[in-house]
Regions:
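Class I S-adenosyl-L-methionine-dependent methyltransferase catalytic core
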Residues: 2-177
Length: 177
């Protein structure tokens, strides 16, 4: 068991040595379905899969039947960063290397709610504060482990005009030396 832990730590070393972001990770279907179910589902809402990645669309093809659907996929000429439709729900797995830009664009689109499947390390107090200052609260969070993905992942759902379920402190504390 201990040897496995040491060998698996090579993942983090390999990530540190990357010269180019490797942001294409297909969301397992079961996880996409779990993420979708965390949302409030209302008839005729417009849902967006911001990075469909392929025609199978783990998210897009599993959105509820009673909603309208749209998608973006840069490889198919529909860039999320150029999207400007009125949207109710954004649900997807963003590229981690573009997280700040992604959050900024999501907030600009002003959905009723949005969810992200992200690495637990991507959920920072600074990002939560930015999202809260835009009028959203963290309403749901689910931690999970996806095989071959680095570390723990989490699904976070933010809702407009909702109080966050967590508290945080942005003060940096120092230990005595």
């Amino acid at each position: 068991f201990f040897i496995n832990l040491i060998m698996n730590s090579n993942i983090s070393h390999n990530i540190k040595k990357r010269t180019k972001a490797n942001d294409v990770f297909i969301t397992p279907l079961e996880i996409a379905k779990q993420q979708i179910q965390l949302h409030n589902i209302n008839d005729n809402d417009l849902w967006l899969d911001p990075c469909r990645n392929n025609k199978e669309g783990s998210y897009f093809n599993n959105f509820p039947q009673n909603v309208r659907k749209d998608w973006c996929e840069i490889l198919e000429g529909k860039d999320f960063f150029e999207y400007d439709e009125n949207i109710d729900i954004i649900c997807g797995n963003p590229p981690y290397s573009l997280m700040d830009k992604w959050i900024k664009k999501t907030l600009k689109l002003n959905p009723k709610e949005f969810s992200l499947l992200i690495g637990i390390g991507n959920l920072t107090t600074r990002r939560i504060e930015i999202i809260e200052n835009a009028g959203y609260g963290l309403s749901k969070m689910k931690m999970l482990k996806i095989y071959d993905w680095y570390g723990m992942s989490c699904i976070v759902v933010f809702e407009k005009n909702k109080k966050s379920i967590i508290e945080y402190d942005r003060k940096v504390y120092k230990t005595k030396t």
